[in-house]
UniProtKB/Swiss-Prot annotation:
Gene Ontology BP terms: translation
Protein name per the record: Small ribosomal subunit protein bS18
Source organism: Nitrosomonas eutropha (strain DSM 101675 / C91 / Nm57)
Protein family (similarity comment): Belongs to the bacterial ribosomal protein bS18 family.
Known partners and oligomeric status: Part of the 30S ribosomal subunit. Forms a tight heterodimer with protein bS6.
Described purpose of this protein according to its UniProt entry: Binds as a heterodimer with protein bS6 to the central domain of the 16S rRNA, where it helps stabilize the platform of the 30S subunit.
PROSITE patterns: RIBOSOMAL_S18
Length: 76
């Protein structure tokens, strides 16, 4: 039981806090924050992103991968 954190940090939606309305597939720096080290999309339950923005985020990452702006895997 000693491994439990003293307090749990409240998750918040980054897009709601910053006032972002639409997620653009060309904003690679923003999209990289929501991709794990091995190239997988981080789920909303971990990032705290609202479902409305998570769907936009998934679509933007898929489009960026298709256009070779983002890699599909970490090393290929």
């Amino acid at each position: 039981m000693a491994n439990r954190p003293l307090f749990k940090r409240k998750k918040f939606c980054r897009f709601t806090a910053e006032g972002i309305k639409k997620i653009d597939y060309k904003d690679v720096d923003l999209l990289k924050d929501f991709i794990s080290e091995n190239g997988r999309i981080i789920p909303a339950r971990i990032t705290g992103t609202r479902s409305y923005y998570q769907r936009q985020l998934n679509l933007a990452i898929e489009r960026a991968r298709f256009l070779a702006l983002l890699p599909y895997t970490d090393q290929h």
